[in-house]
Amino acid sequence: MSLIVTRFAPSPTGYLHIGGLRTAIFNYLFARANQGKFFLRIEDTDLSRNSIEAANAIIEAFKWVGLEHDGEILYQSKRFEIYKEYIQKLLDEDKAYYCYMSKDELDALREEQKARKETPRYDNRYRDFKGTPPKGIEPVVRIKVPQNEIIVFNDGVKGEVKVNTNEIDDFIIARSDGVPTYNFVVTIDDALMGITDVIRGDDHLSNTPKQIVLYKALNFKIPNFFHVPMILNEEGQKLSKRHGATNVMDYQEMGYLKEALVNFLARLGWSYQDKEIFSMQELLELFDPKDLNSSPSCFSWHKLNWLNAHYLKNQSAQELLKLLKPFSFSDLSHLNPAQLDRLLDALKERSQTLKELALKIDEVLIAPVEYEEKVFKKLNQALVMPLLEKFKLELNKVNFNDESALENAMHKIIEEEKIKAGSLMQPLRLALLGKGGGIGLKEALFILGKTESVKRIENFLKN
C-alpha cells in the first residue's frame, strides 16, 4: 500500500469552526492510522480578506485538540511564483488562454442568457482568439476545458460521480491582477504536496470536476476524494452560532475537554458498530473513511454534554486542578488533600463541563448569604431550629476526618428525636449550602470542616 498523505486546508478569513475541525480530524485519523502524513495548509491567497489572527487561531485550535501536523505549515500566499509558473506552462501548451472580456460584457451576456432561460455561463469567445487584444483590458486566464468528455470519479462517500465537460465553462485560473483562483491553487498544492486522499465537506463536490480538469491538463495524479455531508442542527437546518457553529476555542472556554470534543466530532458522520466512546488510540485503530456516512449528521448538545461528563468523571483530582486553571473559582488552599479530593470527586459526578464544575466549587465553598426561598418556606421553624441547635452541639464531639462518623451523628439525632431523615437533612442542607440540592451532606460536612460547618449552621439559626 502506498503512503497515505492527507491535508487540512482552511482559509484564514474567519475562525476555525466545528465543521472544519471535524474535517481535520477525519484527515488526521486516516493518515495516522496508516502511518501516513498529515499536513496543514493555510489557503491565504485572498489577501484582502485574510486575518493573521484567524490563522493563529486555527493553529491554536490544532494545538489544543492535539492534532499534530507533519512538516512546516504551508502558506499559499508565499507560493505565488510557483502558481505563475504553472499558469505559464498551461498558456505555453495552449491549454489555457487570455480572455479579454470586460465585466460589462460578461454581465450583458449573463442577462441575455437569463432572458433565454439558459444557465448563465461564459461563452468561450476568446478560446481560440488570435487577433489583436482590445486596449485597456487586463485579461484573465481561463483553462481550456475539453469538450464532449465525461469526467468520472468514484467518491468514497457519494459513490460514482459523472459530469459532462460541456457543463463546465472555461473557468478562470488567474484573475486580471494575476492572483490565481481557488481551484487552481488547490490543485497545484495537492499535487506538489503528494496528497493521495482528500477528505472535505460536500460543499466542495462541485469543485471536483474542475480540479480534475486541471489535474489532467498538468498530467498530475488525481487523488481519492471523500466528500462528507455537512453537520446540521437538531431541527435539520444548517448549523448557526446558536446551534454549535462557533469558534472551536469557544468550546475550551465553555469547559469542554479536548478528548470529548474529538470523540464527539469523530462520531458525527462516522460510526463503528454501536460504540459511542472512543479514545484517540481506538479512533486510530478503527477509523476508515470508507465508513463515512452519506447522510448529514446532527449536532446534539445533549450528546456532547454526555460525552464530556464521561471524560470529566474519569479525570483524577490533580488532572482536574490543571484543567480548571483557566476558570475562576474559590481559593482551595485552605483544604487539606483529603478534602480537596473529596470535593472534586463529589462535584465531577454532578458536572458536565469544567465551567459548571468551577461554579459548583463556589456553590460549596462560598457560604450562603441567602437561602432558597421555596425550600425555606416549607420548613417547620419550631421543629427545625432546636434540631439544628442540637446537631451543632453533636458536631463538636465528632471526628471530621471520618465521614462515617459524620453520617452517624446525623442518624443519632434522627433516632433520638424520632423524626424522618428529611426533617433534619433538608434544613441542614439549606444551612450548609443555601439550597435544597447539591452534594451529599456527609461530603459537605467533611469538605467544609468543623469550624466552617458550625459557623454556617449558626448563621442559619440567626435568620
Residue map of PLM features:
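Residue-level signal for inorganic ion chemistry
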Residues: 27, 58, 90, 94, ...
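An amphipathic alpha-helix signature
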Residues: 55, 262, 317-325, 384, ...
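N-terminal Rossmann-like or analogous alpha/beta NTP/dinucleotide-binding catalytic cores
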Residues: 1-115, 207-220
